[in-house]
Amino acid sequence: MGKIIGIDLGTTNSCVAVMDGDKARVIENAEGARTTPSIIAYTDNETLVGQPAKRQAITNPKNTLFAIKRLIGRRFESEEVQRDIKIMPFEITRADNGDAWVNVKGDKLAPPQISAEVLKKMKKTAEDFLGESVTEAVITVPAYFNDAQRQATIDAGKIAGLDVKRIINEPTAAALAFGLGSSKENQVIAVYDLGGGTFDISIIEIDNFDGEQTFEVLATGGNTHLGGEDFDNRVIDYIIDEFKKEQNIDLRNDAMALQRVKEAAEKAKIELSSAQSTEVNLPYITADATGPKHLALNITRAKLEALVEDLVASSIESLKAVLKDADKGVSEIHDIILVGGQTRMPLVQQKVAEFFGKEARKDVNPDEAVAIGAAVQGGVLKGDVKDVLLLDVTPLSLGIETMGGVMTTLIEKNTTIPTKKSQVFSTAEDNQSAVTIHVLQGERKRAADNKSLGQFNLEGINPAPRGMPQIEVTFDIDANGVINVSAKDKNTGKEQQIRIQASSGLSDEEIQQMVRDAEANADADRKFEEVVQARNQADGIAHATRKQIAEAGDALSVADKEKIEAAVAELETAAKGEDKAEIEAKIEAVIKASEPLMQAVQAKAQQAGGEQPQQSSAKDDGVVDAEFEEVKDNK
């Protein structure tokens, strides 16, 4: 059995780790980086993921997708999606099931299908490191993700060819990374996780007793639509508004210009974590009848902080609420862990320190802690990590709609999972033969104000006066936070149950089709790579052969020279096509035709008393591989 890898599927960046002995290790990707941008680009020939996708974003803005995690498991009509539609350069569209999907080159793609491309890159990164196939993973999600978002993340794993053994909350994973092996007893930590697109705060108690560590989540909260992207958007809006004041041109109408501004805004935000001011310079950003326009703007750290102070303040309000839910005071928190790239911002660090009255820990890598924790959980599931018990919670209350449009809660938020809870209900009318069980998730009293997870009917109830039949409704939440609901007529014994898949989401058939598409694309990608390698080999041989013809001079007969040059020309023509077999055949033809050339070059070298040159071979892998990598990355 292979390893269970840990994946932090982030909004902005993703990371993969694995247990290496008794420690978790972050794995570098093919580009040598420890994190991979969660960016996917669709070009005419291939699908790019990570840094190669990011590099071409400016010239391909409508087909370069980022921050897809903000769409996963969301309805198109939701307020969050409608807000994103206005600022994303790519097209967000309504799927037939009501979900938010993305339109790329005329094809509608589901967020899990897009996220699967990032997961496939993480999977391959791990496989290249381990030297074996990887089929199992622990994937992290924001603690405040609802059921639909968790299901969609599991779907993304399936499409990527991964058996998702566990979904684990990001702050809990960070706590595992921080606390594993610690000898301290009964410490309570706060994990403040402000990532690219989501914000979580969890209060976690770590106990050490008789050699066993218990990580118990006391309370969790947050906002699944607050993160670095929102900070970036404030800077983007400021830059665009200032340019509009000066030039009376709105750059929001130009997708390519908007992408350039986005990159500059992110860069400026990062620079202002260490500098007091930065210059945004974007020459030739646009043009009008009077000629090209250049964007030049100075942004100070004070200005950035003024633009985003309400976002930071809202995170502190969530912090207060979660501490109250955990029944803990500020003085009872031993350590504060900052997770997520946005926590590098000095204002964030300052406000968190002011709230707790102490500085956060500096020895936890905010970009890698979550993936490391996921790998630890993978080790626990595999049996490689022993004496560790993880007790997570459900982030939102769960219940059903009852008479009058009220939500009746069965499982309160911050209940430790896995858990099971039953409650008996009855009919609202005389002789009612069926009841509809409408499953809800949220904290509001009015059913319509909460998230609808789905509904089902229990039929065949015996006629009786209202209030007489006894309908037992049971909620069962597994360790992934995924919900099963059943309803049973205690009189007849009839039972109906469903695994909640929300009123939206992907059906099993759609997931299987996407898995097949992914496999087909993997085959197409492999063939494309083989063709590129063959082309590079052909180019190297053609170049070397022409050079040797020149070196041979008169030692090569005119007839042989013409024959070799004709073979090289045919090879160059074949290299422009897509047929790998033809390219390889033409390579062999050049090698065969070049035999008189090699003899002539060798004879000339012997006359000069020099060394015998080696024939340009189809096995000159060192040059070919390097050329291939460069071509692929810069596409």
UniProtKB/Swiss-Prot annotation:
Alphabetical list of Pfam families matching this protein: HSP70
GO molecular function: ATP binding; ATP hydrolysis activity; ATP-dependent protein folding chaperone; heat shock protein binding; protein folding chaperone; unfolded protein binding
Gene Ontology terms describing biological process: chaperone cofactor-dependent protein refolding; protein refolding
InterPro entries (UniProt xref): ATPase_NBD, Chaperone_DnaK, Heat_shock_70_CS, HSP70_C_sf, HSP70_peptide-bd_sf, Hsp_70_fam
Lineage: Bacteria, Pseudomonadati, Pseudomonadota, Gammaproteobacteria, Pasteurellales
Disulfide bonds: none
CDD domains: ASKHA_NBD_HSP70_DnaK-like
Biased composition (Low complexity): 602-617
Protein's recorded name: Chaperone protein DnaK
Keywords associated with the record: ATP-binding, Chaperone, Nucleotide-binding, Phosphoprotein, Stress response
Chain ranges passing through the membrane: none
Chain positions found as Phosphothreonine: T198
NCBIfam families xrefs: PRK00290.1 (NF001413), prok_dnaK (TIGR02350)
Record SUPFAM superfamilies: Actin-like ATPase domain, Heat shock protein 70kD (HSP70), C-terminal subdomain, Heat shock protein 70kD (HSP70), peptide-binding domain
Function: Acts as a chaperone.
Family: Belongs to the heat shock protein 70 family.
Induction: By stress conditions e.g. heat shock.
Region ranges (Disordered): 602-635
UniProt GO cellular component terms: cytosol
